[in-house]
């Protein structure tokens, strides 16, 4: 299967074209640019340099959150646009599973992705690498960093942009190498290979936020006061 995967749920933006488990092309950028300006050009540059086209992809896999509200929306919209033009199906992949899949070679390791959810909280989950793939132990959720010690049954390896902040709350935990704890479309592609049967038509692709955006929460708070 040929998979075009997109990751824009956090600071970096990356794209990967994978075929039958092999990465044929990839591009990554983390220079603070708005994903709306970078994600599609990254795709087009990668495909052009590799002699590929959007039509070559059987599946469009995208990081559907949790993470940056804007980044997730941009990724979903980009995936839908590509799929609409090619007829390919889409797959929403948890950004936390994507992080864990970066570490699929660390057999037996307990993995705890921690992505900044603001206000001293993180988006998190738990995975154990078994037979070369992270098996989910806990669903994606929001927790205060202070609650992570109770959440983890044993010291885990930490991933994600809040991994360093979480380290102080988890005695015995350790950071994954930077290249493995950073959001990358390689992890999205790896996860997509395992869950390709769950692919849907592009109009059914939806983001996963886990909480309201700051703007939405502010509006709701104002409505309650009125």
Predicted regions: what they are:
Residues 19-23, 76-86, 129-131:
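A glycine- and small-aliphatic-rich helix-loop capping segment at beta-alpha/alpha-beta transitions
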Residues 48-55, 84-93, 105, 109, ...:
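Phosphate-handling active-site elements
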Residues 13, 34, 65-69, 73, ...:
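Gly/Ser/Thr-rich beta-alpha loop segments that engage phosphate groups in nucleotides
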Residues 1-64:
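N-terminal beta-alpha supersecondary unit
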């Amino acid at each position: 299967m040929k998979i075009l995967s997109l990751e824009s749920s956090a600071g970096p933006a990356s794209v990967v074209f994978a075929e039958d488990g092999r990465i044929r092309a990839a591009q990554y950028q983390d220079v603070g640019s708005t994903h709306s300006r970078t994600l599609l050009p990254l795709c087009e540059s990668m495909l052009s340099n590799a002699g590929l086209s959007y039509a070559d992809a059987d599946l469009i896999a995208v990081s559907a959150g949790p993470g940056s509200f804007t980044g997730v929306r941009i990724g979903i919209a980009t995936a839908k646009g590509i799929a609409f033009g090619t007829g390919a199906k889409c797959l929403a992949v948890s950004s936390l599973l994507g992080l864990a899949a970066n570490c699929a070679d660390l057999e037996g390791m307990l993995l705890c992705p921690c992505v900044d959810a603001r206000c001293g909280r993180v988006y998190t989950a738990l995975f154990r690498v078994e037979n070369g793939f992270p098996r989910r132990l806990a669903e994606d959720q929001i927790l205060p960093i202070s609650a992570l010690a109770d959440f983890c049954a044993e010291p885990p390896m930490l991933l994600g942009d809040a991994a360093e902040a979480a380290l102080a709350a988890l005695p015995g935990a350790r950071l994954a190498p930077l290249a493995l704890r950073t959001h990358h479309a390689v992890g999205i592609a790896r996860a997509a290979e395992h869950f390709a049967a769950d692919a849907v038509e592009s109009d059914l692709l939806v983001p996963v936020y886990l909480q309201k955006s700051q703007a939405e929460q502010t509006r709701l708070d104002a409505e309650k006061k009125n």
